[in-house]
Regions:
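Basic/aromatic-rich interaction segments and small domains that mediate binding to polyanionic partners
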Residues: 2-3, 9-74
Length: 74
């Protein structure tokens, strides 16, 4: 199975559907901490203090990779 999302370990992703049992909502941003196989990801969601609020395994259809182009300032 080809990974059509091009999601890699440490990518930022946005959740496309709420998961009430895990206390994460559509629009929450998480970080991919592991790629188990193509299109299956372990994603960590943190609170405003940086504490883990959820660690969930999701298919690629439930998330979208964020393209964060942060320019360095001097």
């Amino acid at each position: 199975m080809k990974d059509t999302n091009n999601i890699s370990k440490l990518d930022s992703v946005v959740l496309l559907k709420s998961i009430p049992s895990k206390k994460v909502r559509r629009g929450d941003v998480g970080c991919v901490v592991e790629v188990h196989k193509p299109d299956i990801y372990e994603i960590e969601f943190v609170d405003e203090n940086g504490n883990t609020k959820a660690l969930v395994t999701l298919p690629g259809s439930d998330v979208m990779r964020l393209n964060l182009n942060i320019a360095a300032t001097t």
